[in-house]
Swiss-Prot record:
It is found in: Secreted. Its main location: secreted. Expressed by the venom gland. The keyword Secreted applies. GO terms for cellular component: extracellular region. The lineage of its organism: Eukaryota, Metazoa, Ecdysozoa, Arthropoda, Chelicerata. This is Peptide 9797. Keywords: Secreted.
Length: 10
């Protein structure tokens, strides 16, 4: 995945 850092913001 490329949005792994953003996925945690959920």
């Amino acid at each position: 995945a490329e949005n792994r850092e953003r996925v945690m913001v959920q």
